[in-house]
Amino acid sequence: MSLIRALHQQLIDQEISAVAVAQASLARIEAVDDRLKSFLQVTAPQAIAQAEKVDAQIAAGEPIGLLAGIPIGIKDNLCTKGIVTTCASQILRGFVPPYESTVTEKLQKAGAVMVGKTNLDEFAMGSSTENSGYQVTANPWDLTRVPGGSSGGSAAAVAADECLIALGSDTGGSIRQPASLCGVVGMKPTYGLVSRFGLVAYASSLDQIGPFARRVEDAAILLQAIAGHDSRDSTSLDVPIPDYTQALKPDLKGVKVGVIMDAFGEGLDDTVNEAVQTAIAKLRELGATIEEIHCPRFRSGIAAYYVIAPSEASANLARYDAVRYGLRAEADNLMEMYTHTRAKGFGAEVKRRIMLGTYALSAGYYDAYYLKAQKVRTLIKQDFDQAFTKVDVLVCPTAPTTAFKAGEKTDDPLSMYLSDLMTIPVNLAGLPAMSVPCGFDDNNLPIGLQLVGNVLGEEMLFRVGYAYEQATTWHDRQPDLSA
């Protein structure tokens, strides 16, 4: 059952008020977030004001949309007018955007209640949310472990029931990997389906905004609300947005599922492999035909990504110069102001990626690195195109492991980067993909199944994800934070 629909019905039947729902969400945050640290800031006054508007509409007999009165967390790299937006970086400490991002604007119009801005790896660069310039978010299933990243705050908040749904951004796996590690549904839409206007850029050709939820149907409802063309984003797709919930069916008769064989093997935990194989068997039980698919360049994605993404980041992050907003370091002249501010304001991982990108784009190395990486990107896209001539949807693990201990990989960037081995190729190809819970390991840590669709294949992903969810009970399990 959709949690959004259930709450929506209670609201319109006036069994509960939107203000009471908002207060319950805020109380939950107050009760558990000192341990979790999912939120960088809680926007209680704005949440109550929005909820009061929804209650007034209901009292006046006006119709309300499905998201009206629903508590939502917003990743803190999405601009919110009049509300501090930091990207979890000291360089943007205290920055208040003068405008609203397209997605948050749409959510406001839909009546959704933003309860706060969620933590992330600084500028969305990381796989554990340990790179935040402010705090480290814990995994609700085991507070000594990471929630994944970079959208770890959003994933943890939804898993811990601090909010019903949340928004994240996904550049190389930043929605799907934390969704897997926190046991929730996370979706990265087709590149261009959701406007990036107001999303603070990391790698512009890869970034995409998407939903977190505890049910597939709720993710579909949230995507429905934020998708659509926007003239303020030149990469926005001008395509009709279907009603994604119409695609939800309890069986998979006639659906062809391809298993990405290249995702299995070295680096994959045995428990993750077992859970995913069991999930694939369940898809077959539901009526799908299963076929082995080879994407020969699948594992080359990570090498190409760590040239392309830092290159774009080095250009995008050049704008933080301390002139108009954010941190400004003391200096005797302009050049010193730039260098001192950036040295002080950016964290180690952001500096690492800026340097990598600047190097890859430099004269004499551009052809050897950046151009070659773009060629590999094209080949990866061709592999996926070839696969989708045979099947409707592809499956593989979302992440090679379950949640690792905080601090375990901070001194080993390469090991950390491998957390996104399965998710990165999808971003390089601009495809939609979703992680759905498919099991737990021996430590009671969640495992995610990644579903990959063709361009604009969101309906098929929701269909497969929903059918699998209906046939299993993984989504019913919740972390115990009562201690």
UniProtKB/Swiss-Prot annotation:
Annotated family: Belongs to the amidase family. GatA subfamily.
Protein task: Allows the formation of correctly charged Gln-tRNA(Gln) through the transamidation of misacylated Glu-tRNA(Gln) in organisms which lack glutaminyl-tRNA synthetase. The reaction takes place in the presence of glutamine and ATP through an activated gamma-phospho-Glu-tRNA(Gln).
Q: Which NCBIfam families match?
A: gatA (TIGR00132)
List the active site: 75, 150, 174
Q: What is this protein called?
A: Glutamyl-tRNA(Gln) amidotransferase subunit A
Q: Which Gene3D superfamilies match?
A: Amidase signature (AS) domain
Q: Which domain of life is it from?
A: Bacteria
Q: Which InterPro entries match?
A: Amidase (IPR000120), Amidase_CS (IPR020556), Amidase_dom (IPR023631), AS_sf (IPR036928), GatA (IPR004412)
Subunit record text: Heterotrimer of A, B and C subunits.
Molecular function (Gene Ontology), one example: glutaminyl-tRNA synthase (glutamine-hydrolyzing) activity
| UniProt EC number | 6.3.5.7
Which residues are the signal sequence here?
Answer: none
Q: Which UniProt keywords apply?
A: ATP-binding, Ligase, Nucleotide-binding, Protein biosynthesis
One GO CC term on file: glutamyl-tRNA(Gln) amidotransferase complex
Q: Which Gene Ontology BP annotations are present?
A: translation
